[in-house]
């Protein structure tokens, strides 16, 4: 992994592919490369550094091109290991996302007649294609025969000197086509080409497509198949910085709008009715005995918050699983268990694997995602969209709050279907959902004050975040944000666990961030605050109640927002983390070693 782009058409190919790579930089990478073909020749440009280190190829270098930003999985981040990889003749170029699981056996087979120049799993692909081309077949046929030998996940884009077009292939790794006025694009993410077109085709597992300057054709299992063209509902402007220094800061400030989009048309102004664009029947929801959530990273923390909401307001037992552990745990997912997969991109490999495991065991499945047309929406029985809009920063912000808001809507929907939520609870949750965009805006209006607090703690290198109930997932998520972008150690946990180990690490001036909001057992957490203060810690407290806030050394005052008040605290802590990282001069939008969408297990 991490990003693929390509273009064939009448516009300057090298410039378009280079710009596509720049648009994919947000996904995270450690090396990059471009290959252009045309006029019977192939030119390859690679770097072990940044996309900006690559030259912009001229039109004379080729009329079709592919590019790649690499996030290392096999082999170190060097120029030799950067994509594109070529065959022995230097005529075939391949870029690849995913993992070829049987590459070692294939490489052993090929080494007798082929020379390898990298430590990657990808390099077996151009050598296999070379072998088949030697039989006199077309590039399309050679790729079809090659994919029959591959085990694992892959999104491939291939071009070759002396062969027409670009051939692409997909298996368990995202890949889509873009249809512009001057040619056809291919990418792992529409951000690569959104400035040229919003018309896309999502390739399916097993699809192999042949792109020429005038047409595109898709095959699956050797037969030609039809694939739809869809229009994305966002533009290049939505994916820009809009004058902010970083995408992350822009996306923090977009949260009131994202929340309004998540809520719009789904909740009544007066009653407690919820209308969700999903097809799971009331009967299915009534028969659910347990709900299992599978997710990774920030989405996992949103799942923990959803558990609090569902168990409290829908009287439904919920377990939340780290998706990468779900398959390994054994156990059953019976038909009376609803499995909810939460994934921003809809392409997170571990979450997809967990979803497939649950489906194989007969459980109904629901996807909670931000991405129309993504793999999870096609594989789950139903999908519920969080409507956050494009999120470019590696550190998730607006997608977390949108996931929780959508989970709150789902809680009301399930609670009503099961006759488990009282009129009073439903009204309180409805009011919290409706008030959330305005409450978040009130926090954003305090941005200068929060920035000042963040800068005050920028010299610290270890932070603790504590909370209870819904405050715990917010503590976990806020600690994750800080460690992602500042590179400081940050640990989040239940406030009650302080005395069971973490207290040993608290010394003079240790920053401890305490979520003292409603719906987070603030009085009990305040007792834990006293424990760390007696050991010399500095406590940054987040609360709406002045009486609770007095327990902290530094207070960020929040508006009240009922059961969603901890979400409001999270927004304040996003700003806190951002300004610490900015003061340290960190690359906030592209933190080291991290990728936006993790498409390998």
Curated annotation (Swiss-Prot):
Pfam families in the cross-refs: GATase_6, SIS
Keyword field: Aminotransferase, Cytoplasm, Glutamine amidotransferase, Repeat, Transferase
All copies of domain Glutamine amidotransferase type-2, residue ranges: 2-214
Catalytic activity: D-fructose 6-phosphate + L-glutamine = D-glucosamine 6-phosphate + L-glutamate
A molecular-function term among this protein's GO annotations: glutamine-fructose-6-phosphate transaminase (isomerizing) activity
Active site: 2, 596
PROSITE patterns per the UniProt record, alphabetical: GATASE_TYPE_2, SIS
Subunit and interaction comment: Homodimer.
Protein name in UniProt: Glutamine--fructose-6-phosphate aminotransferase [isomerizing]
Organismal lineage: Archaea, Methanobacteriati, Methanobacteriota, Stenosarchaea group, Halobacteria
């Amino acid at each position: 992994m991490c990003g693929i782009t390509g273009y064939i058409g009448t516009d300057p190919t090298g410039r378009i592919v280079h710009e596509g790579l720049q648009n994919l930089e947000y996904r995270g990478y450690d090396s990059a490369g471009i290959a252009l073909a045309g006029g019977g020749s192939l030119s390859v440009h690679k770097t072990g550094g940044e996309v900006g280190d690559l030259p912009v190829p001229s039109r004379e270098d080729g009329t079709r091109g592919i590019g790649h930003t690499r996030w290392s999985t096999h082999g170190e981040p060097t120029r030799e290991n950067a994509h594109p990889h070529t065959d022995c003749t230097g005529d075939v170029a391949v870029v690849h996302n995913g993992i070829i699981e049987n590459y070692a056996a294939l490489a052993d087979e090929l080494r007798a007649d082929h020379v390898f120049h990298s430590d990657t799993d990808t390099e077996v692909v151009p050598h296999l294609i070379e072998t088949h081309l030697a039989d006199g077949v077309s590039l399309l046929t050679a790729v079809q025969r090659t994919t029959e030998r591959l085990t694992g996940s892959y999104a491939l884009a291939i071009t070759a000197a002396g062969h027409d077009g670009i051939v692409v292939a997909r298996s368990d790794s995202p890949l889509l086509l873009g249809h512009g006025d001057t040619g056809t694009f291919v990418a792992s993410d529409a951000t690569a080409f959104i400035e040229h077109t919003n018309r896309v085709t999502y390739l399916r597992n097993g699809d192999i497509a042949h792109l020429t300057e005038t047409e595109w054709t898709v095959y699956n299992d050797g037969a030609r198949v039809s694939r739809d063209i869809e229009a994305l509902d966002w533009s290049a402007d939505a994916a820009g910085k809009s004058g902010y220094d970083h995408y992350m800061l822009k996306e923090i400030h977009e949260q009131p709008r994202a929340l309004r989009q998540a809520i719009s048309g789904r909740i009544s102004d007066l009653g407690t009715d919820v209308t969700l664009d999903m097809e799971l029947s009331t009967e299915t929801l009534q028969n659910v005995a347990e709900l299992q959530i599978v997710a990774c990273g920030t989405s996992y923390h949103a799942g923990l918050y959803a558990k609090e909401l569902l168990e409290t307001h829908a009287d439904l037992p919920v377990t939340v699983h780290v998706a990468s552990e779900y398959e390994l745990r054994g156990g059953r997912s019976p038909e009376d268990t609803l499995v909810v997969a939460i994934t921003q991109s809809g392409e997170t490999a571990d979450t997809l694997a967990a979803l497939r495991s649950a489906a194989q065991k007969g459980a109904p499945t629901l996807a909670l995602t931000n991405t129309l047309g993504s793999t999870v929406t096609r594989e789950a029985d139903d999908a519920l969209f969080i409507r956050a809009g494009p999120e470019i920063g590696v550190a998730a912000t607006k997608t977390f709050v949108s996931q929780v808001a959508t989970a709150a809507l789902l809680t009301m929907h399930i609670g009503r279907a099961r006759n488990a939520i009282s009129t009073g609870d439903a009204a309180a949750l409805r009011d919290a959902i409706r008030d959330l965009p305005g409450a978040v805006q009130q926090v954003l209006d305090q941005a200068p004050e929060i920035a000042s607090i963040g800068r005050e703690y920028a010299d610290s290198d270890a932070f603790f975040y504590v909370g209870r109930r819904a405050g715990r997932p917010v503590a976990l998520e806020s600690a994750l944000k800080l460690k992602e972008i500042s590179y400081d150690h940050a640990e989040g946990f239940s406030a009650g666990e302080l005395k069971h180990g973490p207290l040993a690490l608290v010394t003079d001036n240790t920053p401890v961030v305490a979520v003292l909001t409603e719906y987070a057992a603030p009085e009990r957490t305040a007792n834990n605050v006293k424990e760390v203060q007696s050991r010399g810690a500095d406590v940054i407290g987040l609360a709406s109640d002045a009486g609770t806030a007095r327990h902290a050394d530094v207070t960020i005052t929040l508006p009240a927002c009922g059961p969603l008040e901890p979400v409001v605290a999270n927004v304040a802590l996003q700003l806190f983390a951002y300004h610490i990282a900015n003061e340290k001069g960190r690359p906030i939008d592209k933190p080291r070693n991290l990728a936006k969408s993790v498409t390998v297990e």
